[in-house]
Amino acid sequence: MIRQLNVYEATQRRLKIIFDYFDYVYVSFSGGKDSSVLLNLCIDYLRKYEPGRKLGVFHMDYEAQYRQTTEYVEQTMASHPDILEVYHCCVPFKVSTCTSMYQSYWRPWGESKRGIWVREKPKDCY
């Protein structure tokens, strides 16, 4: 009988392929459950199989997000400085929104709206 891989084992095999094949690996990290699981799997893999190797982490900061999400993202990125190369991006890009009947999009971190920003830009962002 052929043994089926469980999800964790399959993930470890796939991470090996990724880290063997690519010199630079980046994870897009929102602070949500899916990207959190992937980021932590990558960190654990590197600590176990490739100590000293770096992992790029890209976080697009939307300005108006839950405070707990922002705190979790900051805590997670700060807790692995030996592994993570963090790219914390705070740029005024066009984001669709469903919270207004008059506008179909908004721009976080727009300089022209600085007076009404939900919070100040983090000092470590691009």
Regions found by a protein language model. Name each.
Residues 1-126:
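ATP-dependent adenylation/nucleotidyltransferase module used to activate substrates
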